[in-house]
């Protein structure tokens, strides 16, 4: 079982929205100080607009024309003196840390598929709704399958979990978590991140080790093994008797075949869940 140590990559995150105040500045004054919302709404900084250049607190100077070109669909981070777009193409997959609102946490998009619900809510609200389904977590030991950006593991700790073990298969996903200010809570000592295939990792866990299990996998077409009877059997084995499982399968209204939900329910019942 491979332990992953989370380390946040320092640097301000900018979006098209966060620099709108700068873009709107008219150069009436030779120099103007502008307050900018950064880190997807978590922080504010002051920058100096000097003609056609913008000077950030660390002294980095960026042309105003370049800031004007930032796309609403991307996030950018000031890392080691340069502004880097937060996307990646790796091993046939395209990853993007996607802004969804001016002051809301981002979602992770993989090959065009968002990892959170963003219609009439933001990724954090989506997470809170799901985690709340587990009920009170104070003092409990929680297994969190599919770390993603870490929002669910962070929310579980905020709800009082004594310890959270969260499992993520894709190192690129954890890389984007290291760039995301909203994921910084993953450095909490109560959270243990395991890098590995959940199918194999669960086999190494003790029986009846967890008070609650949070299972929010990618859609079935991307990770069918996480919906299998065999995997559900492992979830049942590691969950204490009387413990609670939350399993998100997507919005039922979006399933063209209701038999999918019925199949999930049947397999869960077959391994012992009620």
Report each predicted region and the residues it spans.
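N-terminal auxiliary segments of SAM/dcSAM-dependent transferases
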Residues: 2-101
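Conserved class I S-adenosyl-L-methionine
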Residues: 137-148
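Conserved SAM-binding loop of SAM-dependent methyltransferases across substrates and taxa
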Residues: 149-161
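S-adenosyl-L-methionine
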Residues: 167-206
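Conserved beta-strand signature within the Rossmann-like core of class I S-adenosyl-L-methionine
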Residues: 242-250
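Conserved Class I S-adenosyl-L-methionine
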Residues: 257-274
């Amino acid at each position: 079982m491979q332990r992953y140590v989370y380390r946040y990559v320092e640097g301000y995150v900018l979006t098209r929205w966060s620099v709108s105040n700068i873009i709107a500045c008219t150069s009436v004054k030779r120099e103007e100080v502008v307050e900018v919302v950064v880190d997807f709404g978590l922080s504010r900084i002051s920058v100096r607009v000097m003609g056609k250049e913008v000077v950030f607190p660390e002294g980095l100077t960026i042309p105003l024309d370049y800031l004007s070109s930032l796309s609403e669909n991307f996030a950018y981070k000031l890392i080691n003196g340069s502004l880097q777009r937060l996307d990646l193409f790796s091993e046939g997959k395209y990853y993007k840390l996607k802004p969804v609102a001016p002051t809301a946490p981002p979602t992770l998009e993989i090959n065009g598929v968002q990892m959170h619900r963003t219609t009439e809510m933001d990724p954090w609200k989506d997470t809170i709704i799901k985690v709340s389904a587990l009920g009170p977590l104070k003092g409990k030991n929680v297994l969190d399958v599919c770390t993603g950006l870490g929002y669910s593991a962070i929310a579980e700790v905020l709800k009082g979990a004594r310890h959270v073990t969260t499992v993520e298969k894709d190192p690129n996903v954890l890389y984007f978590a290291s760039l995301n200010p909203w994921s910084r809570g993953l450095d909490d000592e109560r959270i243990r991140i395991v890098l590995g295939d959940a199918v194999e990792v669960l086999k190494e866990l003790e029986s009846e080790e967890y008070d609650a299990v949070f299972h929010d996998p990618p859609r079935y077409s991307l990770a069918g093994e996480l919906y299998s009877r065999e995997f559900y059997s492992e979830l049942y084995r590691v969950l204490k008797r009387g413990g609670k499982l939350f399993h998100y399968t997507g919005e039922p209204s979006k399933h063209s075949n209701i038999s999918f939900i019925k199949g999930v329910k049947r397999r869960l019942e077959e391994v012992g869940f009620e």
